[in-house]
Each structure stands twice: as C-alpha cells, then as structure tokens.
C-alpha cells in the first residue's frame, strides 16, 4: 500500500467529456476509468483496486488488514469530514464488480453516518437500506451458498451497523419538527417500508434460519459435532457467524422496542454466562452483555443483571489491549462500559450484594458511591439521571402517522420506559431505610420499628409497616439463573443480606451476609505485583 500523499480531489475545473465516448463499451469503460482515476488520490485508487482484488480472491488476511487498518487510516487522512468517492467513480475503477460494489457501499454509507456533520440525507438513508437489501438478497436468496470470505469483525460490524441505521432512521422519522410536508409525505407514503421493523426482523431471522445456528449451538451444548446439523450454508464460517451475530442483533432490536422477555428469549441457544467459541469479537461480547444486563434489570432480575455486568466489566479490564489500537472501537467500548457501571450502581442500590473487589474499586475511584448513597436515601432524580445516561436509545416500532401533529416524537419511547423504571423505584425507595434498621437487631417489635420510621406513629402506621415489610420480602426475592441454555430460567432466591419472619408483633431477624473472601483479593494483588516486578527487571536502562 502506498504512503499517504495528502492529495485531495482535484478542484481544477475538470469536466466530463461526453464526446470522448466512442460507442464501444470496452473503450468507453476504459475512458471512464481513466477519467475518475485522475480525480482520485493515488493511494485511494490503489487501495480500492487492491481491496477489490482481495475480496475476489477471498484473501482473508489482506481483507482484514485493509478493513481494520487501511480503510480507517485513509478515512482519517482524506475523508475525515467528507464522504468517500461516489459509486460511479469506484465502479469505473473495479469494473463494476457486483459483490465488491455492495460491500464498498456498505462502508460508504456507514462512513457518512459516522463522520459527515449533520448526518446522512434522506436519499442516502434510503439508498443505504436498499444496499443492505441487495447484500442480504445476494446471500439468502441464492440456491447455493455464496462463496464469499469476510473477516468476522466485518460481519459483526455489518450486522451491528444494520441495526444501528434502523434505530437512527426510526429516530429521524419520529422528529417531524424539522421536516417539510413534502418530506413527511415521502417518508410516510412513498418509502413507508424503508427501514421498517418487519424488514429488520425478517432479515435477522432469515440469517438465523439459513445458518442453522440455533441447531449448531444446541449440538455443541450436547457434545455433538455441529456439522451434522449445519446444512450446506451453516457449515461455512461466513453464514455461521452471520447467524450468530444476527441473534445478538435480535437481542438489541427487542431491547430497543422495550420487549425484554423476547430479547432474552432469542438468545436461548447461547449460554449467556459461559464463554463460547463464538465470543471472540470483544465488541460483540460487550454489546451482548450490555443488552442482556439491561433486560434483566428491567425484568427486576437484579442478581442476574449484577452478575452479567460484573463479569463483562472484569473482562473489559483484562482485555483492553485487544481493542485499544482501534480508536473508534475503543471509544464505543469505553462508553458502553461507563453505561454499565451506572446500571450496576442502580442494581446494587436496589439489590445490595457482594461483587468483585476490583469492580468495587472502580466504583470508589469514579465517585459512584456518592450517587449510590443519594439513591439509597431515596433521591429519585439521581435514579432518573443514571437511567437516562445508561439506557439504550429506545425507538417506536411504528412511525408517526402522516396527519400527526408536527411535533418531536423521538423522546416518547424513552419517556415511557423511564416511567416504567421509576414506578418500580418508587415502590422500593423506602426499603433501604427499613433494611438499615433491621440490620441492627436480631429481634425488634413492630411498634418500635414503626416509631423509628415515624416518631409519631400510631396503630394505622403499624399496619402500613406490615405492608412495607411484605414489600421488602417480595422485592428481595428474585428469579436467578443457575444453569441451562435459557436465560429466562431460574429459581427464586432471596438476595437480601438479611432475612426475617414475624411472630405475633415481634420481628425475628437473621443476618445472611456472606463474608468477604479476602484470599482471592490478595492472590490477585500478589500476582499483579510479581508481573510488574518481572517487567521492571526486563527494562534496560
């Protein structure tokens, strides 16, 4: 690959000479290739030609290197705030190779969504959708498997971007305040099926079905060779990984729609809390845990949410070097990690339990404990701000009607989910106070506890206290996953650090808190110290 020369597109007034066309297709194509190539920086031209050649030959190493390294570098150098060359310009260079042009346009529109100030125009959003349709029709509708080799990281980011652009378009079409009547008419009538939820679900389910990924995952769980159930398509890594990533895409889509039960349900073949051979893409693993943990939290399965968040945050701490070389991926993962720390803090307030010491250390260093203390004291605004920062950007499955008032409907799904969450928080906001009193005693009369909570308590307040204690019992019993491929399964367990029962007017309290295992903490610190010591000895001064 040639070095970057810093050249930009020519602005010297070149014009397209129609009279240079001879009518001979071969000569005309050669003219167009030379014309567009002359307007393009040399390193961009050679990159595109080499990229096309690598895709044609199925050279996975070169494709991955150009996708992960060269393409972002050229984007930074030449197209930081502008789009890559148009389809006609690139097509002339690569002889309009059908497969490569679809892949190029996927990167082209992805770059526009990520880099162009103001975002893509309506026609670019529509063209991107139809380009995805071309790609998925190419690989799903074919009678035989398409012999296409792409690196797993590209397949993951392709599916992830597909869902992201659906989400982005849903928010775009819900914002009517910045659109003319003509644009609304075009969105609601002419292009009503573009980026529709049915299209998205149809594509993702089709990829899952054609790859037989569910059957393959079930076979692996049962110790059976997955190739016996994979079929002609599923035995190819290309289809297999697209199927797996589509399961994660479905998890994300259902989470964005607020259907948390279905979000966990679609992952049933995947044992969420176990490592698998398919979880080698860090961004995929982190995204999966984020949406699974959030779904658990909204289903009031706090113990499962805490375990999910804790496990993945530990994984991020240990594997940062795997993705730190790619700045945009690093930024995305860091943001998602920050969101998960916020969600973990919420879960620990609503459902206190022991977590790994290194996660506790991060919570202390980032001053989460101050906010957690405010939440424990019933500060609803802190709950609200944490939720709004950390939750997904929800969307509505249906666009506003063509005759809907000219308003901004983007926040409606978010406000609905926030209301659902805050209703649950309001039911629990007094429980930390109740817990703090119960932890001080082994036996405590009901009347005395009522007087602690309200010094002017009367008999009616004692009756209300029974309701509060029943609420405490109910909220502290969660469905907790223990084993099996379904993340929806589990057994009811009490997650509180204490338990109690009431005999007549006396509360009998038992402390069930599990003592800290300090041995593991010191072993980790000793190993870290030894590793640091070895590195210091290897430094030559």
Swiss-Prot record:
Pfam family for this entry, one: Paf67
Entry keyword Nuclease: no
GO BP term, pick one: formation of cytoplasmic translation initiation complex
GO function terms (MF aspect): translation initiation factor activity
Alphabetized PROSITE patterns for the sequence: PCI
Domain PCI: start-end pairs: 308-516
Localization (cell): Cytoplasm
Disulfide-bonded cysteines: none
Example of a GO cellular component annotation carried by this entry: eukaryotic 48S preinitiation complex
UniProt KW keywords: Cytoplasm, Initiation factor, Protein biosynthesis
Task of the protein: Component of the eukaryotic translation initiation factor 3 (eIF-3) complex, which is involved in protein synthesis of a specialized repertoire of mRNAs and, together with other initiation factors, stimulates binding of mRNA and methionyl-tRNAi to the 40S ribosome. The eIF-3 complex specifically targets and initiates translation of a subset of mRNAs involved in cell proliferation.
Family: Belongs to the eIF-3 subunit L family.
Subunit structure: Component of the eukaryotic translation initiation factor 3 (eIF-3) complex. The eIF-3 complex interacts with pix.
Cited HAMAP family: eIF3l (MF_03011)
Name by which UniProt lists this protein: Eukaryotic translation initiation factor 3 subunit L
Species whose genome carries this gene: Drosophila pseudoobscura pseudoobscura
């Amino acid at each position: 690959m040639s070095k970057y020369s810093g050249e930009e597109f020519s602005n010297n007034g070149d014009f397209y000479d129609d009279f240079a066309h001879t009518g001979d297709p071969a000569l005309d194509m050669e003219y167009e290739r030379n014309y567009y190539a002359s307007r393009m920086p040399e390193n961009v031209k050679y990159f595109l030609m080499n990229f096309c050649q690598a895709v044609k030959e199925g050279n996975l190493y070169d494709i991955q290197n150009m996708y992960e390294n060269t393409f972002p570098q050229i984007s930074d150098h030449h197209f930081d705030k502008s789009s890559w060359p148009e389809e006609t310009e690139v097509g002339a260079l690569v002889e309009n190779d059908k497969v490569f042009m679809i892949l190029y346009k996927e990167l082209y529109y992805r770059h526009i969504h990520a880099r162009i100030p103001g975002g893509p125009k309506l026609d670019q959003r529509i063209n991107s959708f139809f380009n995805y349709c071309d790609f998925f029709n190419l690989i799903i509708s074919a009678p035989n498997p398409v012999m296409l080799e792409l690196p797993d990281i590209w397949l993951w980011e392709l599916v992830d971007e597909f869902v992201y652009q659906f989400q982005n378009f849903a928010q775009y079409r819900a914002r009517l305040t910045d659109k003319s009547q003509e644009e609304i008419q075009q969105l609601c009538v002419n292009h009503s099926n573009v980026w529709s939820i049915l299209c998205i679900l149809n594509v993702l389910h089709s990829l899952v079905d054609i790859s037989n990924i569910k059957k393959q995952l079930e076979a692996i769980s049962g110790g059976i060779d997955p190739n016996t159930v994979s079929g002609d398509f599923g035995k190819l890594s290309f289809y297999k990984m697209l199927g797996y990533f589509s399961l994660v895409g479905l998890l994300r889509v259902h989470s964005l729609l607020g259907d948390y039960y279905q979000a966990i349900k679609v992952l049933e073949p995947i044992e969420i809390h176990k490592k698998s051979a398919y979880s080698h893409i860090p961004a995929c693993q982190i995204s999966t845990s984020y949406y699974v943990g959030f779904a658990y939290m909204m289903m009031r399965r706090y113990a499962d949410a805490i375990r999910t968040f804790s496990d993945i945050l530990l994984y991020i701490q240990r594997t940062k070097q795997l993705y730190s070389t790619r700045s945009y991926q690093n930024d995305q993962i860091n943001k998602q990690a920050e969101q998960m720390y916020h969600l973990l803090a919420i879960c620990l307030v609503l459902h206190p339990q022991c977590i790994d010491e290194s996660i506790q250390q991060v919570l202390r260093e980032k001053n989460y404990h101050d906010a957690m203390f405010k939440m424990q004291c019933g500060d609803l605004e802190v709950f609200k701000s944490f939720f709004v920062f950390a939750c997904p950007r929800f969307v509505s499955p249906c666009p506003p009607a063509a005759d809907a008032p000219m308003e901004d409907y983007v926040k409606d799904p978010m406000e609905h989910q926030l209301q659902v969450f805050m209703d649950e928080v309001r039911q629990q906001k007094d429980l930390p106070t109740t817990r703090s009193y119960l932890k001080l005693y082994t036996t405590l009369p009901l009347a005395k506890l009522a007087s602690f909570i309200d010094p002017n308590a009367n008999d009616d307040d004692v009756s209300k206290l029974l309701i509060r204690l029943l609420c405490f019992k109910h909220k502290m019993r969660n469905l907790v996953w223990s084993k099996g491929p379904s993340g929806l399964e589990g057994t009811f367990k009490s997650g509180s650090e204490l338990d109690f029962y009431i005999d007549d007017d006396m509360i009998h309290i038992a402390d069930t808190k599990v003592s800290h295992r300090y041995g593991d903490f010191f072993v980790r610190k000793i190993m870290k110290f030894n590793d640091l010591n070895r590195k210091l000895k290897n430094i030559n001064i």
